[in-house]
From Swiss-Prot:
PROSITE patterns for this protein: AP_NUCLEASE_F2_1, AP_NUCLEASE_F2_2, AP_NUCLEASE_F2_3, AP_NUCLEASE_F2_4
Single GO MF annotation: phosphoric diester hydrolase activity
Organism: Thermoplasma volcanium (strain ATCC 51530 / DSM 4299 / JCM 9571 / NBRC 15438 / GSS1)
Protein name (Swiss-Prot/TrEMBL): Probable endonuclease 4
Region forming the signal peptide: none
GO BP annotations, alphabetical order: base-excision repair
């Protein structure tokens, strides 16, 4: 990939979700191909409860590769199966155990962030309480725990900025937020036409200082559809709103992770669109 595109990724702290096929230690080099200084990955199969432990050798190789490729932050995405909000005591406990394991795995490889979905519960207040209780029960952790906003499908918690703010309220800076732009759009936040209102609401309900990262995704479906379908940047319904976010000086230094269709195969296309719209 040409150096101009790499410089865009580096300058605006844009990264992407990277495959760990063949081993965790291969991910940093894959990220560096695009000029990424940050990237996201799964440390285990995201659709299974069980996992193979990360060996000390594998952890050290990963940490060494992160350093040698000048990666400044890494984000683990937790399993999709985890539902800390569940009204089922059995599922809640199983989810909590998996959550703790995810934290331990992230810390073993010196990951900067662990992002997780809030989960679902027909009773929002109960769900939020159970999520907060789970976070409180976690022993001291050095990896930052990031709650991700949701698209608003079914009984899923966290589609409103206010709910995300409720979840992190009362915790110190080791707990923060990752805002997914596609999810926000699907939940009814008009990032394109009402960008400043969106940022103002993030600041008032959460605090920009507690938003540590973004998932930079365009949206395939309409505003307020509650349908979570990511699209390539510039090919979806959000479009220019993402450029506003990327170039917003208030958000500089916060990782912006692409989770777009076709993964690494289309990151270059995303970056070309971004470069064109930025005029660089």
């Amino acid at each position: 990939m040409d150096d101009d595109l790499k410089s865009i990724a580096s300058k605006y702290y844009i990264g992407g979700h990277i495959s760990v096929s063949g081993g965790l230690h291969l991910a940093p080099e894959r990220a560096s191909i695009f000029g990424f200084r940050t990237f996201q990955f799964f440390s285990k199969n995201q659709m299974r409860w069980n996992s193979t432990p990360i060996s000390e050798e594998e952890a050290l190789r990963f940490i060494s590769e992160v350093s040698s490729h000048s990666i400044s932050s890494t984000m683990v995405h937790a399993s999709y199966l985890i539902n800390l909000a569940s009204s089922s005591n059995e599922l809640h406990q199983k989810s909590f155990n998996a959550f703790v394991e995810e934290i331990q795995r992230a810390e073993r490889i010196d990951a900067t962030f662990l992002t997780f979905h809030p989960g679902s519960n027909g009773n929002k207040d109960e769900g939020i309480r159970k999520i907060k209780e789970a976070i409180e029960k976690v022993e001291t952790h050095k990896v930052k725990l990031l709650v991700e906003n949701t698209a608003g499908q079914g009984n899923v918690i966290g589609s409103t900025i206010y709910e995300i703010g409720q979840i992190i309220d009362g915790f110190d800076s080791s707990v923060g937020v990752c805002i997914d732009t596609c999810h926000a759009w699907a939940a009814g936040y008009d990032i394109t036409n009402k960008y400043d209102e969106f940022i103002d609401e993030l600041d008032s309900a959460i605090g920009l200082d507690r938003i540590y990262a973004f998932h930079l995704n365009d949206a395939m479906k309409d505003l307020g559809s509650n349908i979570d379908r990511h699209e390539l940047i510039g090919r979806g319904k959000i479009g220019e709103g993402l450029i506003k976010l990327i170039s917003d000086v208030r958000l500089f230094g916060k990782p912006k992770i692409m989770e777009t269709p076709y993964g690494e195969a289309k990151f270059e296309e995303n970056l070309k669109y971004i470069r064109k719209k930025l005029g660089e």
